[in-house]
Amino acid sequence: MKSIKLDIKKKNSLRLTKQEKKNVIQDFEKYGILKFSDITQSHKLLFNFINQFSLSYANDANRRPERFDNSRIRNVDAGNQEIFLHSETSFSPSQPEIVWFYCVNPGSDGSGKTVYCDGLELWRKLSPKYKMFFLENPIEYKLRVPINKKISGNKKKKWFLEYPGVRNCFLNYRKNSLEFNFIKFAVEKSRIAKKLSFANHLLIPLESEPQILGRGFLNKKKINKEDYNYITALAYEITEEITWKKNDLIMIDNLRFMHGRRKINKKNKSRDIVTIQTMISNFGFGSTTSLK
């Protein structure tokens, strides 16, 4: 992770020049995760800074409580439990390109550290045996996604969701939700040409994601417990922690990195991290990386 300290003069506006923005994008595409130390105390300036890199925002974040009177800034997942490695919403068409985390308060004892795993490195470390399996066998998720506004009708209605990999899509009036199956591979194209990243929702228990009703491989193939445990152990072997300080901002390439959280001590009631999810960035995918 590369740390960036913005010029103190910038703290009044956080408005970057074209060259400064280009430098941030170049570092982001190279490293995949950036830390802006003590960026600002102003939540308005924070959002204005993020807006310089965002074309649109992910709707999935709406399931979390809103913060600072801004519908784009949300709480992270509630509770004190450990959250296992995952790429945010990688089980659905709502997967954001960039996930931002901002530290309002690091907490009283440092528990609940955010963790991250580089999917590029993890994919590189996997043996050809596993790579062949994941390249040949896509995952199929069975989903039930809540709809924010109340809908009226009876039973279910066939629905059209225009996104590759979506099938069996229905509007469920009784559940006030959209239900569909989503087919997706466990590996992603990265911003670096000809390099793949292992960033997905395979390592997180299903009970952590109420939207996922089922998960399996499309061709009814299975990973045995020994192989699953090996891949999980390998992921955590290269996992790193973020030591939070007040007003730190982390920018994560969600198509490259998986992230999670250590367990929070029950006595640590002051930890406060918020998230913003950029659905589509406003700079070209892989625009600064060379064709190596």
Question: Where do the language-model regions lie?
Answer:
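Short secondary-structure capping/junction motifs at helix and strand boundaries
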Residues: I33-L34, Y57-A61, S108-K113
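Glycine-rich loop at the start of a catalytic domain that most often binds anionic cofactors/ligands
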Residues: H43-S56
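Cytochrome P450 catalytic domain signature, combining two hallmark sequence patches
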Residues: S54-N62, K131-F133
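Glycine-rich nucleotide phosphate-binding loop and flanking beta-alpha elements
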Residues: S42, F91, M258
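TRNA-binding/sensing appendages of the translation machinery
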Residues: I25-S37
